[in-house]
Amino acid sequence: MLSDELESKPELLVQFVQNTSIPLGQGLVESEAKDITCLSLLPVTEASECSRLMLPDDTPNHTNSSKEVPSSAVLRSLQVNVGPDGEETRAQTVQKSPEFLSTPESPSLLQDLQPSDSTSFILLNLTRAGLGSSAEHLVFVQDEADDSGNDFLSSESTDSSIPWFLRVQELAHDSLIAATRAQLAKNAKTSSNGENVHLGSGDGQPKDSGPLPQMEKKLKCTVEGCDRTFVWPAHFKYHLKTHRNDRSFICPAAGCGKSFYVLQRLKVHMRTHNGEKPFVCPESNCGKQFTTAGNLKNHLRIHTGEKPFLCEAQGCGRSFAEYSSLRKHLVVHSGEKPHQCQVCGKTFSQSGSRNVHMRKHHLQMGAAGSQEQEPAAEPLMGSSLLEEASVTSKNLVSMNSQPSLGGESLNLPNTNSILGVDDEVLAEGSPRPLSSVPDVTHHLVTMQSGRQSYELLNQGDLTERRT
């Protein structure tokens, strides 16, 4: 952890190692620890206290006792000034504690730091008391990347007379280089083996993060007869659901009942019910809205004129703005005709061609049949049906006698049994022409009802004979 003094001036610090455990060398670890105060290289107030830490003895010739040094005297030993160009300059203060300077047991920690030296800050954060264990944490902060100012290091770097904090800084520098090289090697190995797999978001699609490296498709479908391979685990999982027909996400709307493999597809489908269209065309004077980003992308090709989907059939060369249009077009080259006319049975490769055929032929035939039926329906609604010998109807079941005769209602049997006509008689609204009824010779039938009797002759005339 960083002390409060370091947090007060973050602009002076560049973290050298982030919470990295750096074990000290065996040459720096002594069996006996020395009790001195922590030395802060940043000026702080008088009230601040530095925690007491256990430091190893610098040399084996030192005694096993140490004198406690007041922290305020050490804090005044350095003054740090930040220049206008961001460079740091250090100057020793004129006033120094005589007790600190006159102590023979205390190591000369700041003896090698001169005002002209462009050295870097050394920030020691000792989480436990003492440096005798390799598990103790050291956090080093260095604000300069230029090593040209380290001229105070003597050629005999392994000499025990070098201050201990300089040896610790050297160990930290070497450890950082080794850790950086190890991390770079690990990243290179990961990218080459294709282990850096990123999963997509809710629809199962990976996020677009620039050009992807060429990775081997290791995920192979285990279903018999399917040889598809995948890179992304989300795609592979979605593909396996298509084999199992695992449509576990069902639309809750009443009367819909559609099901989907993934939840994202269901969410997109729900926009068709609630009318939500969040994707708007940005072109001027257009403003069309769409439920999905894919539909908007396909629509924008109308404005740009882009047709990226090209038919690869020999001699075709047609291109389309949408992949679905290309897929429909490929049926033409395959010779398959799945769309059949329900009236005449003719088949077509495209549903649009079938619809054009039905509007052109079958609707005209229906209109012509209705026009032929209208003139023939007029005599049915006009005069009596008995005046036409060739016209009979199932609706003619009863007829009333004249009121002047005072007779009752005369119920006639079905005219089909009387005239011998089959069931293929014309009803009102039938498209068949009325002239298609065959002319059948009828016999005389006498019917009596009360005081009157009627006769149906061959000629179809109705005669009345009083009794």
From Swiss-Prot:
Residues the entry annotates as binding Zn(2+) 3: 281, 286, 299, 303
The name this protein goes by in its record: Zinc finger protein 410
Residues annotated to bind Zn(2+) 2: 251, 256, 269, 273
Gene name of the record: ZNF410
Domain of life: Eukaryota
Residues annotated as binding Zn(2+) 4: 311, 316, 329, 333
Species per Swiss-Prot/TrEMBL record: Bos taurus (Bovine)
Its biological purpose: Transcription factor that binds to the sequence motif 5'-CATCCCATAATA-3', and is specifically required to silence expression of fetal hemoglobin in adult erythroid cells. Prevents expression of fetal hemoglobin genes HBG1 and HBG2 through CHD4: acts as a direct transcriptional activator of CHD4, a central component of the NuRD complex that represses transcription of fetal hemoglobin genes HBG1 and HBG2 in erythroid cells. May also activate transcription of matrix-remodeling genes such as MMP1 during fibroblast senescence.
Chain intervals for the UniProt region annotation (Disordered): 84-111, 187-214
